[in-house]
Swiss-Prot record:
Function: Small subunit of the glutamine-dependent carbamoyl phosphate synthetase (CPSase). CPSase catalyzes the formation of carbamoyl phosphate from the ammonia moiety of glutamine, carbonate, and phosphate donated by ATP, constituting the first step of 2 biosynthetic pathways, one leading to arginine and/or urea and the other to pyrimidine nucleotides. The small subunit (glutamine amidotransferase) binds and cleaves glutamine to supply the large subunit with the substrate ammonia.
PANTHER family: CARBAMOYL-PHOSPHATE SYNTHASE SMALL CHAIN, MULTIFUNCTIONAL TRYPTOPHAN BIOSYNTHESIS PROTEIN-RELATED
Family matches, as CDD domains: GATase1_CPSase
Species assigned in the record: Bacillus anthracis
Protein name: Carbamoyl phosphate synthase small chain
Gene: carA
Keyword annotations from UniProtKB, A to Z: Amino-acid biosynthesis, Arginine biosynthesis, ATP-binding, Glutamine amidotransferase, Ligase, Nucleotide-binding, Pyrimidine biosynthesis
Subunit comment: Composed of two chains; the small (or glutamine) chain promotes the hydrolysis of glutamine to ammonia, which is used by the large (or ammonia) chain to synthesize carbamoyl phosphate. Tetramer of heterodimers (alpha,beta)4.
Reactions mediated catalytically: hydrogencarbonate + L-glutamine + 2 ATP + H2O = carbamoyl phosphate + L-glutamate + 2 ADP + phosphate + 2 H(+)
Pathway(s) served: Amino-acid biosynthesis; L-arginine biosynthesis; carbamoyl phosphate from bicarbonate: step 1/1; Pyrimidine metabolism; UMP biosynthesis via de novo pathway; (S)-dihydroorotate from bicarbonate: step 1/3
InterPro entries: Anth_synth/Amidotransfase (IPR050472), CarbamoylP_synth_ssu (IPR006274), CarbamoylP_synth_ssu_N (IPR002474), CarbP_synth_ssu_N_sf (IPR036480), Class_I_gatase-like (IPR029062), CPSase_GATase1 (IPR035686), GATASE (IPR017926)
Record NCBIfam families: CPSaseIIsmall, PRK12838.1
């Protein structure tokens, strides 16, 4: 079955269709990860996007029940050079092709993914549509140019609060499109976690008596989530806070800094990040299309703690007065290296120190 990818600039790439037979539009992006395709297609941060894999062969170890990062996949489509029809792995339960058919997610194989990746790198992220061969190219292009993708966080966030009990520190995890890996890392440390929707107010969060607040990853432009920014303005300084990815960007906006769209984003499993204080370099998993503007941090109470070695963009922030820090990358990995996993320990240490300071103030009062 032939299928085509039509881009907003009029480019048409023809290949072989796989997966669902539906037509889908989305922001066409690329990821450089050689593995981790199951985590990618189930990562809510990819909501509304058509993901191109730069590695030439995808699907060779199939799909299993353990490696999902959310219950429902959020991608609008997959593009690969070659899809493996006969996966081989002891954990394999279903092929990638069959899984995408079940979930009605379209895929495109047999195109020059290097050519497509170079185009995105040169011209920036493009809107595109995976469609049948009889599609009207001119009409599709006009529709793509007029399309604005919004409300991604609303689509992927939990609708209702729910607990993930533990015996340790109580952590309220604000779900902007949370990867399960973040929750797993908190559970490993026996945290008593309450997951809440993206639009939960500061008053509602504080009513839960949290020891700490975790801001999750999520899709899209952080400025599309004004209710979260307002919530953070009322939260910062009252409870220890740790933010990841979109949570990092929202924290920056709430603190007076600014964010902007990257030309083609950071998506992959091997992005080097430098800790400014120690000089240590961590290889990190990343998935974001926006970043905090470095110059906008200067007139705030924030300090930059980490930078990307590939392009110098801001990768970490810390508040100068209050117990709060954030990173742009994914310390929970899933998939990817675990170089930055100790940030979860730093978060718990910050909570303990904040508690001790509060106890000392009470004793001295």
């Amino acid at each position: 079955m032939k299928r085509q990818l039509i881009l907003e600039d009029g480019t048409v790439l023809i290949g072989t269709g796989f997966g669902g037979e539906i037509e889908k539009s989305g922001e066409v992006v690329f990821t450089t990860g050689m593995t981790g395709y199951q985590e990618t297609l189930s990562d809510p941060s990819y909501c509304g996007q058509i993901v191109t894999f730069t590695y030439p062969l995808i699907g060779n170890y199939g799909i299993n029940r353990d490696d999902f990062e959310s219950i429902h996949p959020s991608v609008n489509g997959l593009i690969v050079n070659e899809i493996c029809d006969h996966p081989s792995n002891f954990r394999n339960e279903i092929s990638l092709n069959d899984y995408l058919k079940e979930r009605n997610i379209p895929g495109l194989a047999g195109i020059d993914t290097r050519k497509l990746t170079r185009k995105i790198r040169q011209y920036g992220t493009l809107r595109g549509r995976l469609c049948n061969m009889d599609a009207d190219v001119e009409y599709i292009v006009s529709q793509l140019k007029a399309t604005v993708f919004t409300d991604h966080v609303k689509r992927v966030s939990t609708k209702d609060p729910y607990p993930s009990p533990g015996r340790g520190h109580r952590v309220v995890l604000v779900d902007f499109g949370m990867k399960h890996g973040i929750l797993r890392e908190l559970n490993k440390r026996d945290c008593d976690v309450i997951v809440v929707p993206y639009n939960t107010t500061a008053e509602e969060i504080l009513r839960l008596s949290p020891d700490g607040i975790m801001l999750s990853n999520g899709p899209g432009d952080p400025k599309d989530v004004p209710e979260a920014i307002e919530m953070l303005k009322d939260i910062i300084g009252k409870v220890p806070l740790f933010g990841i990815c979109l949570g990092h960007q929202l924290f920056a906006l709430a603190s007076g800094a600014n964010t902007s769209k990257l030309k083609f984003g950071h998506r992959g499993l091997n992005h080097p990040v430098k800790n400014i204080a120690t000089g240590k370099v961590a290889i990190t998993s990343q998935n974001h299309g926006y970043a905090v503007e470095e110059e906008s941090v200067e007139n705030t109470e924030l300090e930059i703690t980490h930078v990307a070695l590939n392009d110098g963009t801001v990768e970490g922030l810390r508040h100068k007065k209050f117990p709060a820090f954030t990173v742009q990358y994914h310390p929970e990995a899933s998939a990817g290296p675990e170089d930055a996993n100790d940030l979860f320990e730093d978060f718990l240490t910050m909570i303990e120190n904040f508690k001790k300071e509060g106890e000392e103030l009470c004793q001295n009062a």
